[in-house]
Amino acid sequence: MEEDYGVFILDVEGTVCPIAFVREQLFPYFLDKVEELINNADETERDLLADMQSRHGGAAAASLLRQLVAEDVKDPALKALQGRVWERGYASGEITAPVYADAVRFIQRNAGRVYIYSSGSVQAQRLLFGHVSNPSGDGVLDLTGHLAGFFDIPAAGRKTEAKSYERILAAIGLERQPGAAIFVSDSVAELDAASASGLSVRLAVRPGNERVSGARYTTLTDFEGL
């Protein structure tokens, strides 16, 4: 029996776009700009750098940034700094986001019912969905107007904690009807947390994703099946 959901909450990396985009394009782009970021930091960026350093033993900014990126640490200050650097890359046309064609169609078809939840900052999420490579031809698509909202670590909490999903459900008015929403991600740990909050879940299986053996969740290979 086909289930009908009123709200869709989507992960980004490995779900709506390839893991390779983040790891092989966005992260290297940021690392290439580290020295420029530090040397030309505005007041907000200086505050973010100082906050990050204070929480990581006062290490030198450049080496700390590279270390946190290499270890994929979900540091809020790092995510904010990455968002600011990527904003310049999107604005210059150096970066466009390769969102899967089926995900583009799904978001367009379900306008106003799709939320994004990522460890990347809300700013980075808006940039990504505002600069999508057009899968049907040339040019860039802006999908932000089709999306109902964005959540990140500061807004909701870490994605491996059930309370984070409870906060999202409360924010969108579904705390009493968690089963009316579905969360899609390539991470079993995230699905475990979301499921504990009462959300329905699907495991995204995309090219390049880590293989999940003995998966206990229904898989989704593209959004035409949702």
From Swiss-Prot:
To which species is this protein native? Answer: Eremothecium gossypii (strain ATCC 10895 / CBS 109.51 / FGSC 9923 / NRRL Y-1056) (Yeast)
| Quaternary organization | Monomer.
Q: What is one Gene Ontology biological process annotated in the Swiss-Prot or TrEMBL record?
A: L-methionine salvage from methylthioadenosine
According to the UniProt record, what class of enzyme is this? hydrolase
The record's principal subcellular location, in a coarse class, is cytoplasm
Protein name (Swiss-Prot/TrEMBL): Enolase-phosphatase E1
Q: Please give the superkingdom of this protein's source.
A: Eukaryota
- Entry cofactors: Mg(2+)
Which Enzyme Commission number(s) are on file for it? Answer: 3.1.3.77
GO CC, alphabetical? cytoplasm; nucleus
Q: Which InterPro entries match?
A: Enolase-ppase_E1, ENOPH1_eukaryotes, HAD-like_sf, HAD_sf
Instruction: State a single Gene Ontology molecular function.
Output: magnesium ion binding
- Provide the catalytic activity annotation: 5-methylsulfanyl-2,3-dioxopentyl phosphate + H2O = 1,2-dihydroxy-5-(methylsulfanyl)pent-1-en-3-one + phosphate
Tell me the residue numbers annotated for binding substrate.
S118, S119, K159
Name the family the entry cites: Belongs to the HAD-like hydrolase superfamily. MasA/MtnC family.
Signal sequence residues: none
Q: What does this protein do?
A: Bifunctional enzyme that catalyzes the enolization of 2,3-diketo-5-methylthiopentyl-1-phosphate (DK-MTP-1-P) into the intermediate 2-hydroxy-3-keto-5-methylthiopentenyl-1-phosphate (HK-MTPenyl-1-P), which is then dephosphorylated to form the acireductone 1,2-dihydroxy-3-keto-5-methylthiopentene (DHK-MTPene).
- The entry marks the following residues as binding Mg(2+), namely D11, E13, D186
The record's keywords, sorted A to Z, are: Amino-acid biosynthesis, Cytoplasm, Hydrolase, Magnesium, Metal-binding, Methionine biosynthesis, Nucleus
Compartment(s) of residence = Cytoplasm; Nucleus
Which Gene3D superfamilies does this chain map to?
Answer: 1.10.720.60, HAD superfamily/HAD-like
